[in-house]
């Protein structure tokens, strides 16, 4: 046993210090970035925000809606190969360049992903997603995926520390997904006692990944556009959003009615709801590590997307960053005890 004495920080623990700026307008800020990935060699440009690969967020409808903003969608892994084929045949090339295929690490997952990629060679991103990216089996699967799909950009996660980030990149991942327990419907930290405050995880993993020519995704912990800006300021190349994009027309959640008001169900992918829906229930040897919530219907996602991008542009103007790429270089975090004036929050 050992104790690390260094304080680790989440997004709620800091604010970004404003700095002198020459920008006249938020419209002067360029949010698009261009990346050339380490192993695949592919180049991608767009807004580096990703809708999470949850079945109540990462849907085909969400992908079509967010692609108009240049935003990526990690489509959840529960679509069949036939559904994928129907989607790609009806979607434009501009939509498909912003789509990721998600997979688990079972033999069945591998075979289905192989089929999807064979039928739809225009898809360039594969997101290998497990709750615990520290297992030897996971690292071996990433290496297997790299060998099988050498020209695809591979995302692997989730982890929260630099040494594991490096191992995944050296095993074939182009991008590492960072975050254990910060999600809005994730209960891993309270069920297991395991986790890492998200901002510190991003800072540590970004340093490790960039040293090897890889990239990272900050996955989880964002509750408002300011948190997205903090994640980018901390060194994240991409930011993945779940709860902030849930409850919309494109989210695909079940709609329920209570007292004449309609709500959409949103749940973590390790929740009892998800496991009951996809694998017939919670296995006897495990506990559910997610919860189910009812969200008021929020209308089309385009309004939320504009709000997020507007907040991000504004953050850049406050520190003089004319491009999103410059935000991390211009970010100084200050530790705080308060984030906002909450006097009217209950109204």
Curated annotation (Swiss-Prot):
GO biological process: purine nucleotide metabolic process
Entries under InterPro entries matching the protein: Aldolase_TIM, GMP_reductase, GMPR, IMP_DH/GMP_Rdtase_CS, IMP_DH_GMPRt
Record field: catalytic activity: IMP + NH4(+) + NADP(+) = GMP + NADPH + 2 H(+)
Class of enzymatic activity (EC top level): oxidoreductase
UniProt keyword list: Metal-binding, NADP, Oxidoreductase, Potassium
UniProt-annotated binding residues for K(+): 181, 183
Protein EC: 1.7.1.7
Entry similarity comment: Belongs to the IMPDH/GMPR family. GuaC type 1 subfamily.
Matches recorded under PANTHER family: GMP REDUCTASE
Record note on quaternary structure: Homotetramer.
Cited function: Catalyzes the irreversible NADPH-dependent deamination of GMP to IMP. It functions in the conversion of nucleobase, nucleoside and nucleotide derivatives of G to A nucleotides, and in maintaining the intracellular balance of A and G nucleotides.
Protein name: GMP reductase
Species, as recorded: Klebsiella pneumoniae subsp. pneumoniae (strain ATCC 700721 / MGH 78578)
Lineage: Bacteria, Pseudomonadati, Pseudomonadota, Gammaproteobacteria, Enterobacterales
Gene transcribed to yield this protein: guaC
């Amino acid at each position: 046993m050992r104790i690390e004495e260094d304080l680790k920080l989440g997004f709620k623990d800091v604010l970004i210090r404003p700095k002198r700026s020459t920008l006249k307008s938020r419209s002067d800020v360029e949010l698009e970035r261009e990346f050339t990935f380490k192993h695949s060699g592919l180049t991608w440009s767009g807004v580096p925000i990703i809708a999470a690969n949850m079945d109540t967020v990462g849907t085909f409808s969400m992908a079509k809606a967010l692609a108009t903003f240049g935003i990526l969608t990690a489509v959840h892994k529960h679509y069949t190969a036939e559904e994928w084929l129907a989607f790609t045949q009806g979607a434009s090339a501009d939509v498909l360049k912003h789509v990721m295929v998600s997979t688990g690490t079972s033999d069945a997952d591998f075979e289905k992903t192989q089929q999807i990629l064979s039928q739809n060679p225009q898809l360039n991103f594969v997101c290998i997603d497990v709750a615990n990216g520290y297992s030897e089996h996971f690292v071996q699967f990433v290496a297997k995926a790299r060998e099988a799909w050498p020209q695809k950009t591979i995302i692997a996660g989730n982890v929260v520390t630099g040494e594991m980030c490096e191992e995944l990149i050296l095993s074939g991942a182009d991008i590492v997904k960072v975050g254990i327990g910060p999600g809005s419907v994730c209960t891993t930290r309270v069920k297991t006692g395991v986790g890492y405050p998200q901002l510190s995880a991003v800072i540590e993993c970004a340093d490790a990944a960039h040293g090897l020519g890889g990239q990272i995704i900050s996955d989880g912990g964002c509750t408002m556009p300011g948190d997205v800006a903090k994640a980018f300021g901390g060194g994240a190349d991409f930011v993945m959003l779940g709860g902030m994009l849930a409850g919309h027309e494109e989210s695909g959640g079940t709609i329920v009615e209570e007292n004449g008001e309609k709500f959409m169900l949103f749940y973590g992918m390790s929740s009892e709801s998800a496991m009951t829906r996809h694998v017939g229930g919670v296995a006897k040897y495990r506990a559910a590590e997610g919860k189910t919530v009812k969200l008021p219907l929020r209308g089309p996602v385009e309004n939320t997307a504009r709000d997020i991008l507007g907040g991000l542009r504004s953050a850049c103007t406050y520190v003089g960053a004319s491009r999103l790429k410059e935000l991390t270089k211009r970010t100084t975090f200050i530790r705080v005890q308060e984030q906002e004036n909450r006097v009217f929050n209950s109204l």
